[in-house]
């Protein structure tokens, strides 16, 4: 019988212990107490962070929104029908992140960055947090570079700059989305990346917008984020934040981006629904107390950041370049009531508003912008030199026209000066009309504004003004292509260019009768 040496036994045990694979992992687990309308109450989930991702059985995720003494209230991100009472769930230790990067351009994704356009997976290499702190005061720069929308009324009277927040507000079905889509189409070739966030809209409406962008070759520089009316309230609430994170990717690397939130009213409705289901105390119009903070923390992230910020963020890879994220939030009003809770909140947060009126839309003035109460708080600082020089008289003419038009209804005989002002105002109002998907370049806009300012429309019938404009632009393209190209490239305005414009209009008028 073989004798075992005690030292050998101890050696074998040591080897076994050394080769033993064991790992302990502490998991923070809880139990689902109730599931109602996409809201899940969880018991026993200690040390969970606000906004942390929670993993349920079946690979479904939720987000912690209410942290109470003995329970956690979470919203489910996806289909909650597989989650049942008594199931286990665990913390992930991660805040919600979405994919970011240029790979997303040309694609349609949901609020979590998952592709929904049937074009296969998106191979992004980076993700970023949905909730981020806006850049501080010290990292910001003043807004002084233009974002050309391509619409005469907006670029002339309410100029938008890179890094600005300009609200588009009005009733339903009066062209709010049309302005936003035109803005995206006009960025083709400008280097500005666009993000269109559709919140709570019909899937057919979103498909129509995507189709229009594809038709005009604008999808190559655009990301579309869709949280449709059939998506859970949590997705509609998160979509704008996800879009903002995708836009910040470009801003932080010294590029320019434009984001459109269509519309923030539906995001506020979704947030109200979530808050009421979480049993948070309701306030005015049943909105929770922090609905202002919901929109302010989102819109403050749109900014123009300094060269130092970009250099620091990119670790010195990008130098001497500013970055910007321009926001065009849309708010839907009920019967023109801008004094409701959400409209007043967003008006106070943004740097100006484009107010669209139903009466003007129904009268055929499209875009139906009311020039009297629409304003850009950045103003001329963000306009190109030529547009700034030529647009001054347009707002004045429209303001005087509105005042005199109201007065002339009661007065029977008007003096010649008043009649002249009224007629000029009528022509300018007609000139500000513009078809959808037909944005103008800087030079084309300058030519049209010059014709209005210098009284070249006086002898044109009001109903022929738009025909004259079309002929003018066509003639300029054929005969004065160099002048148009020069203004488009430089934005300059001087006596020589003014002479060319005058000569152009005179030649056109001499060539045919109006």
Swiss-Prot record:
Keywords: ATP synthesis, ATP-binding, Cell inner membrane, Cell membrane, CF(1), Hydrogen ion transport, Ion transport, Membrane, Nucleotide-binding, Translocase, Transport. Pfam families: ATP-synt_ab (PF00006), ATP-synt_ab_C (PF00306), ATP-synt_ab_N (PF02874). ATP binds at residues 170-177. GO terms for cellular component: plasma membrane; proton-transporting ATP synthase complex. SUPFAM superfamilies: C-terminal domain of alpha and beta subunits of F1 ATP synthase, N-terminal domain of alpha and beta subunits of F1 ATP synthase, P-loop containing nucleoside triphosphate hydrolases. The keyword Transport applies. It catalyses: ATP + H2O + 4 H(+)(in) = ADP + phosphate + 5 H(+)(out). It is found in: Cell inner membrane. The record marks 374 as: Required for activity. CDD domains: ATP-synt_F1_alpha_C (cd18113), ATP-synt_F1_alpha_N (cd18116), F1-ATPase_alpha_CD (cd01132). GO terms for molecular function: ADP binding; ATP binding; proton-transporting ATP synthase activity, rotational mechanism. Its EC number is 7.1.2.2. Produces ATP from ADP in the presence of a proton gradient across the membrane. The alpha chain is a regulatory subunit. HAMAP family: ATP_synth_alpha_bact. Belongs to the ATPase alpha/beta chains family. This is ATP synthase subunit alpha. The gene is atpA.
């Amino acid at each position: 019988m073989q004798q075992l040496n005690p030292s050998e036994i101890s050696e074998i045990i040591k080897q076994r212990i050394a080769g033993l694979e064991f790992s302990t992992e502490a998991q923070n687990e809880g139990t689902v107490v109730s599931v109602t309308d996409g809201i899940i109450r969880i018991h026993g989930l200690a040390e969970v962070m606000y906004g942390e991702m929670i993993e349920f059985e079946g690979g479904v995720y939720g987000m912690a929104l209410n942290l109470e003494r003995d329970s956690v209230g979470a919203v489910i991100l996806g289909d909650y029908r597989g989650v049942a009472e008594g199931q286990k769930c665990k913390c992930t230790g991660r805040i919600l992140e979405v994919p970011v990067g240029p790979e997303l351009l040309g694609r349609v994704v949901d609020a979590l960055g998952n592709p929904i356009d049937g074009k296969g997976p998106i191979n992004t290499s980076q993700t970023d947090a949905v909730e981020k702190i806006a850049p501080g005061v010290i990292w910001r720069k003043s807004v002084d570079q233009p974002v050309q929308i391509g619409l005469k009324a907006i670029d002339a009277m309410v100029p938008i700059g890179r890094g600005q927040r300009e609200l588009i507000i009005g009733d339903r079905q009066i062209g709010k989305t049309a302005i936003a889509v035109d803005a995206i189409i006009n960025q083709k070739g400008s280097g500005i990346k666009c993000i269109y966030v559709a919140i709570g809209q019909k899937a057919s409406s979103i498909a129509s917008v995507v189709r229009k962008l594809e038709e005009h070759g604008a999808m190559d520089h655009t990301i579309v984020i869709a949280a449709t009316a059939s998506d859970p309230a949590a997705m509609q609430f998160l979509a704008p934040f996800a879009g903002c994170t995708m836009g910040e990717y470009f801003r932080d690397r010294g590029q320019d981006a434009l984001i459109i939130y269509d519309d923030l009213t539906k995001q506020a409705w979704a947030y109200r629904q979530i808050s009421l289901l979480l049993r948070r105390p309701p306030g005015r119009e049943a909105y929770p107390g922090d609905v202002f903070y919901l929109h302010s923390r989102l819109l403050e992230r749109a900014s123009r950041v300094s060269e130092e910020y970009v250099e620091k963020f990119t670790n010195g890879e990008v130098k001497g370049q500013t970055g910007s994220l321009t926001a065009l939030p849309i708010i839907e009003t009920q019967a023109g009531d801008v004094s409701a809770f959400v409209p007043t909140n967003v008006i106070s947060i943004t740097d100006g508003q484009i107010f669209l009126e139903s009466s003007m839309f129904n009268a055929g003035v499209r875009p139906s912008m009311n020039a009297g109460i629409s304003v850009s708080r950045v103003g001329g600082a963000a306009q190109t030199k030529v547009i700034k020089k030529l647009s001054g008289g347009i707002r004045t003419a429209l303001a005087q026209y509105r005042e005199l038009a109201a007065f002339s209804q009661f007065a029977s005989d008007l003096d010649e000066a008043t009649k002249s002002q009224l007629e000029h105002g009528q022509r300018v109002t007609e000139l500000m009309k513009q078809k959808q998907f037909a944005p103008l370049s800087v030079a084309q806009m300058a030519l049209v504004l010059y014709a209005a300012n210098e009284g070249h429309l006086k002898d044109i019938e009001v109903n022929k003004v738009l025909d004259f404009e079309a002929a003018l632009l066509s003639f300029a393209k054929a005969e004065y292509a160099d002048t148009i190209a020069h203004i488009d490239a430089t934005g300059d305005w001087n006596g020589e260019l003014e002479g060319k414009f005058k000569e152009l209009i005179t030649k056109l008028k001499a060539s045919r009768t109006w």
